[in-house]
């Protein structure tokens, strides 16, 4: 019985450590993304933060890394409901920089498809997977 409890506790601890590491990685990614966007598209974060804070009480980068489909809908409304414009704006403003930082610029289309279909959990899985690979590839920014 004690051995079983030890094995269970060890697995729980390893899972906890893994989750904490992912959260720390996402926090660092968020900061790198904020710095990159502030340098390359000045004022864009501030604009979208107004919308995000008013509607969801959270900044746009936190929304991007938790509920990206909500951020996409904010961009869609800002673009007057024009899907093509929203796709382009969302890709340029958020997905391309994210993909560059992750070291995989080819991710934009996949991430956009996941966001548009509301598959936020899968979006996050792709980001986390590429975050780990990006460390070995040496993502930019």
Task: Name the predicted role of every residue range.
Residues 5, 25, 35, 59, ...:
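Acidic-enriched, low-complexity/disordered segments with a strong bias for Aspartate over Glutamate
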Residues 6-60:
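Short terminal alpha-helical segments
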Residues 9-10, 26-34, 46-47, 68-71, ...:
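Short amphipathic alpha-helical segments that mediate assembly, nucleic-acid/protein binding
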Residues 43-96:
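Amphipathic alpha-helical interaction modules
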Residues 93-141:
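Amphipathic alpha-helical binding modules
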